[in-house]
Amino acid sequence: MIQMQTNLDVADNSGARRVQCIKVLGGSHRTIATVGDVIVVSIKEAIPRGRVKKGDVHRAVIVRTAKEIRRADGSAIRFDTNAAVLINKQGEPIGTRIFGPVTRELRGKKFMKIISLAPEVL
């Protein structure tokens, strides 16, 4: 469960390290986002010479959450941290590599490029 002011780790090599959610996209009164949802983030921490800079505003898709995700078969999956991947307006990742596992729920949300770059899909 990601909401406004939530800090997330960045799971790609775009140059950002930490981001903060400033808006959950998908409706005027939507307050909560989960895996596969698109949010608007502000870059809070970035590395030198990266593609993005501190203070930039970008879109991101959530790939891992600490709150468990319920699946249709009754199982649940959760992670230690909240993580996101920065994307452009067309929904393509800004970075060229993805770090750490991502969930199968991204497949249903049409983020196949992120799934193909990820080292592990759970």
From Swiss-Prot:
Domain of life per record: Bacteria
Cellular component, GO, one term: cytosolic large ribosomal subunit
Alphabetical list of PROSITE patterns matching this protein: RIBOSOMAL_L14
Cross-referenced InterPro entries: Ribosomal_uL14, Ribosomal_uL14_bac-type, Ribosomal_uL14_CS, Ribosomal_uL14_sf
GO biological process: translation
SUPFAM superfamilies in UniProt: Ribosomal protein L14
UniProt GO MF annotations: large ribosomal subunit rRNA binding; structural constituent of ribosome
One matching Pfam family: Ribosomal_L14
Keywords, sorted A to Z: Ribonucleoprotein, Ribosomal protein, RNA-binding, rRNA-binding
Subunit-structure text: Part of the 50S ribosomal subunit. Forms a cluster with proteins L3 and L19. In the 70S ribosome, L14 and L19 interact and together make contacts with the 16S rRNA in bridges B5 and B8.
Task of the protein: Binds to 23S rRNA. Forms part of two intersubunit bridges in the 70S ribosome.
Family the UniProt entry places it in: Belongs to the universal ribosomal protein uL14 family.
Name under which the protein is recorded: Large ribosomal subunit protein uL14
Lineage: Bacteria, Pseudomonadati, Pseudomonadota, Alphaproteobacteria, Rhodospirillales
